Amino acid sequence: PSGPGGVAIPRAGLKKYVLPPDYSGIVFPERTKLKFMDKVPAVPKVRREPRQLRDIRGPSREATDFTQGQYGILALGGGYLHWGHFEMIRLTIGRNMDPKTMFAIWRVPAPYKPVTRKSLGHRMGGGKGPIDHYVTAVKSGRLVVEVGGRCEFGEVKPFLTQVARKLPFPAIPISRDGLQQMRQEEEEKRLNNQNPWTFERVVTANMLGMRKYLSPYDLHLKGRYWGKFFLKHRV
């Protein structure tokens, strides 16, 4: 406001600045960028395997928690990663991250599972076809890659979102705190559920004889997973 004669009166204001985050406990690995993954496993002779779709069925039991990084990409469904997906992840993150202040590590192994395919126009029969390529099986709830360092989630979220959209299964960028909050919300939803007719109760009581239509996986996973798909609306 102006004083007498239109002269501005100087006033001292009190400003409160937000304290910067503390990065003192972060340990950087020797190599800050993602390492190159081999297209073919280094084994003398690979045996041709059945499909074994159980590799991508249900929840993951490994790589479900953060180890070094603060941010990462979380799979919300099952699927197979080809070597091209590994290169896409490595190149996209490598171009966008600052290796002096950030680091990234893999949470999935290199392609190890052989996938066979017969040549185009080949007739039926004649045994199993030759190995065409190798893939890595990923289950729902597994971390694909971790990113950490002296950075905030807003800095890494754009390129992590770009990577997550190109993966062959539903995935989201997430932080360490966000993962913990997501699990707390799922637990609260389960404890505060007002609907008495849950999937677990209906199946346990064998209502309308539905057991004969369900598999042992449905009983074990309580209907939250349908093959490789994660049904997040189920309680």
Annotate the PLM regions:
Residues P1-V235:
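Ribosome-associated RNA-binding proteins
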